[in-house]
């Protein structure tokens, strides 16, 4: 099969499109013929900064496709099922073997590109907002990097839950789209100071709850937070030092929580949230925003675009 692999970490150009042996499904796994691959922030970070443990390492967390083989212990999937999946590596390929517990059936009316982008973006946003953040109707929520996959999901879910949503992004098209998806107020970070804008919008009180997938924005996120507010930081898309002074948040009785979704996808609550999000796509209750689709053969260009073009939503590749 063909796959996008790398032998040394670095810029997008380290990715090579080559022939590699087909994977074989283990007893507890299914084998997917991949039809759509969602490029996730973790894929970019791993390729950029994580030495591959083996030669011709296949990066990639998320993809959707059709089941072509099942392991001897698999009971809930059969050949021909349309599924979307999450695993810690291997999605940037024509075929992908994943555990039975880390894939979900795709409902009718949901295409493969949409399905590939749902689990990480929407399960992460849902977990941050409601499981960890305990977001309540009427609260104000600040969403950093709101034009990314997790950010766009969080804007929609928070708005539907009755929160006042303040989104941070840049660019006219992105700002317009965020308003359409439910943001009450959008701070253009290229033109305005985020903390000052938030303080002005909230009449000086600050935000009840912040989702920060950037990492390097943590000082600003904390400064925008109200007394006794909550902040969830999920990842480090900014790639910088996450050191922050914890004395001011302690004095303000604020709560900081970290979320790393990798080990959580087999939990029943997270699995159910992914199923619910997938069911919400076809009726239009949620919108999966895809900026651009590349062929897998152009994986290096797709990664370059994801890192530098300031896309709105996810970048998808197709084998």
What are the roles of these predicted feature ranges?
Residues 21-38, 49-90:
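Glycine-rich beta-strand-centered segment in the early N-terminal region that forms part
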Residues 45, 82-145:
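NAD(P)H dinucleotide-binding glycine-rich loop of Rossmann-like/cofactor-binding domains
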Residues 82, 140, 164, 229-230, ...:
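Short glycine-centered segments of the SAM/dcSAM-binding site in methyltransferase folds
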Residues 116-118, 122-191:
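Mid-domain Rossmann-like dinucleotide-binding core that forms the NAD(H)/NADP(H) cofactor-binding site
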Residues 193-204:
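Short amphipathic alpha-helix with an adjacent loop that forms part of the alpha/beta core around
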Residues 217-285, 319:
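Glycine-rich phosphate-binding loop and adjacent beta-alpha segment
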Residues 268-319:
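C-terminal hydrophobic helical "lid"/dimerization subdomain
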